Amino acid sequence: PEVPISATFEGNVLYVEFTTPVGNVDIAIKDATQNVVYTSSMDVTAFGQQVAISVENYQAGTYIIEFRNSKDGYVYGEFTLM
């Protein structure tokens, strides 16, 4: 099934767009050692709703971004900063 999330970078900002309303979502970014470097919660109530996450102060390396909602939905992605 299609995942209702897309993510793009513009400079040092990661833009996450939800392509369908999914309710309350917890967002976490973890570094390569599983340390949580970012957390946020938001209520996604509209098509195309976005969040902008600055990664300006992150070290170079690989990160995992995780999304969880109250209906036991879970999806993750990986990105690398140079």
Please provide the spans of the model-predicted regions.
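Short, glycine-anchored, charge-dense loop/turn motifs used at functional sites
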Residues: 31-35, 63
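Beta-strand signatures of extracellular beta-sandwich domains
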Residues: 26-30
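Short edge beta-strand/loop segments characteristic of extracellular beta-sandwich folds
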Residues: 10-19
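Short proline/glycine-enriched turn/loop motifs at strand-loop junctions of beta-rich domains
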Residues: 20-24, 58
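C-terminal tail/sorting-segment detector
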Residues: 64-82
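Short, surface-exposed loop/turn motifs with a glycine/proline- and acidic-biased composition
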Residues: 44-66
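Solvent-exposed serine/threonine-rich low-complexity stretches and specific carbohydrate-binding patches
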Residues: 37-45
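Transition segment at domain starts
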Residues: 1-9
